[in-house]
Design a protein with these regions (language model features):
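N-terminal Rossmann-like FAD-binding beta1-loop-alpha1 element of flavoenzymes
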Residues: 3-30
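Glycine-rich active-site loop/strand segments that organize a redox cofactor
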Residues: 39-62, 130-134
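Helical element adjacent to the flavin cofactor pocket in flavoenzyme catalytic cores
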Residues: 190-254
Length: 457
């Protein structure tokens, strides 16, 4: 009889753990507290225009090797596409953004789109200092914010507005004035290493031509159905049961215990408290999770009666108002898309503290004013679907760099998974799936499985 693993949480880290453990012969049971799988990456219905959209458009990079291994496993990797992106200025001009190693060279030579001539030499010198320090990723950077780091290397405000503040917002989902500098340095160090190994293509950016449920969830559900695995929805786990130094099951909210030979706890940082009460060392995990507070992202699936006039599938908006960070053009992303019920654009705003509580009407009015300044056309709104993810990601403030816990616990058959655990990445989809890879590897090793799962890079 196959060994049984119970996975608490059906987000990306839980799904990847389930699929890979299933591949190596485990009997899998998933406990998901919501009514659907996918966690913080899921599709949303927009019945007003008869469309299926997402709860927030994501950018993916070729360096996301663990995420793409998961897509291969569930049969959806062929939905990924990679193509150039651009930067859109307030004056309506748009500039192609260099990708891979080219983006770093563009910055080093002060050739940022829209950068005033007077700031080019300053930007070059600042970038030399910035990327040199990023490559080292000194833990001392955890004592200062990203904004302070920019000031120390002499980064001009113009360069920050055009690229560097958007960089921090995009990868950390936090304001430069609040985010620790170390996670940004660590991610850039990882990026540079992977770019060298990948011939400069590791940080080419891409998107999928299907919704999140189709991309991440449906293929996994097919696997679970074909292999007889169980998925329990609206299943609230209360505590992992430990006996004689091993996990033996999961106690549910109704008092029932689901037996297990192993447990993967794949919940967000803010949901872990209570689950590990019987686990030695749980206080340190709870303390770590308390430091990794959540940050919001506001996304708008915008349907217009005509095209904006985008030139790239993704255009970053260089604007100090921080009302829109990115504009995704679904007509470019999905050639031949039926526009009879509206031209669809996805707008995203990271670390959206300022606009998160705005009424929808105020938000859309402000965003449309900005779009009309930046784009050649001025279409009208057909419908706007606003999605507020209050707990979109965790955020790392100064002093939290060493807080993220390992996937391995003091219980050999219990592992943690989730983007908030220790990985090479900050709070990203790749971080979530890499955590699953690490968790599965740790579990297989501790259980001395005869056929260990192939782990990602």
């Amino acid at each position: 009889m196959n060994q049984k693993v119970v996975i608490i949480g059906g987000g990306l880290s839980g799904l990847a753990s389930a699929v890979w453990l299933s591949e190596s012969g485990w009997d899998v049971t998933i406990l998901e507290r919501r009514a659907a799988l996918g966690g913080r990456t899921h599709a949303v219905s927009v019945p007003q225009v008869g469309d299926i959209a997402d709860n927030g458009q994501h950018i993916m990079a070729r360096a996301f090797v663990n995420l793409f291994r998961y897509l291969d496993a569930v049969g959806t990797m062929d939905h990924m596409h990679f193509s150039p992106i651009g930067s859109r200025m307030r004056d309506g001009s748009v500039h192609p953004t260099k990708q891979g190693m080219g983006s770093q060279l563009q910055m080093l030579f002060g050739a940022l789109p829209g950068l005033p001539r007077r700031d080019r030499l300053k930007t070059t010198l600042a970038c030399l200092r910035f990327f040199t320090q990023a490559a080292r990723a000194d833990i001392a950077l955890d004592k200062i914010t990203v904004a302070e780091w920019y000031r120390r290397v002499g980064m001009p405000d113009s360069a920050r507005e055009i690229v560097f503040d958007l960089l921090a917002l995009g990868v950390l989902n936090e304001l430069p004035e609040l985010a620790s500098a170390y996670p940004l340095a660590s991610l850039l160090s990882t990026a540079m290493k992977k770019s060298v190994r990948g011939g400069g293509s590791a940080f080419e950016f891409g998107y999928s031509d299907v919704d999140f449920d189709t991309l991440y969830v449906n293929g996994a559900q097919r696997i679970f159905s074909e292999r007889g695995h169980q998925v329990h929805y609206r299943a609230i786990a209360r505590q992992i049961e430990i006996r004689n130094g091993r996990a033996v099951g999961v106690r549910m909210a109704d008092g029932d215990i689901i037996d297990a030979d192993a447990v993967v706890c794949a919940v967000p940082a803010w949901n872990v408290r209570g689950l590990l009460d019987q686990v030695p060392g749980h206080d340190s995990v709870y303390a770590a999770s308390a430091k990794l507070i959540s940050a919001p992202i506001v996304s708008v699936n915008l349907y217009l009666d005509g095209p904006l006039g985008s030139e790239f599938w993704l255009e970053n908006i260089a604007s100090p108002e921080h009302i829109i960070d990115n504009v995704f053009d679904h007509q470019i992303m999905h050639p031949g898309r039926d526009t009879g019920r509206g031209f669809r654009y996805a707008l995203t705003t990271s670390a959206a503290y300022m606009i998160n509580d705005w009424p929808n009407e105020r938000l859309i009015d402000a965003q449309m004013r900005l779009l009309r300044q930046c784009y050649p056309n001025s279409p009208h709104v057909v419908h706007a679907n606003v999605v507020r993810e209050n707990n979109a990601t965790f955020t790392q403030r100064p002093g939290t760099a060493l807080s993220r816990p390992s996937q391995q616990t003091q219980i050999p058959n219990l592992v943690l998974a989730g983007d908030w655990t220790k990985t090479e990445w900050c709070s990203t989809m790749e971080g979530a799936v890499q955590s699953a890879s690490f968790a599965v590897s740790a579990l297989q090793s501790s259980m001395s499985a005869s056929s260990p799962v192939h782990v990602g890079i």
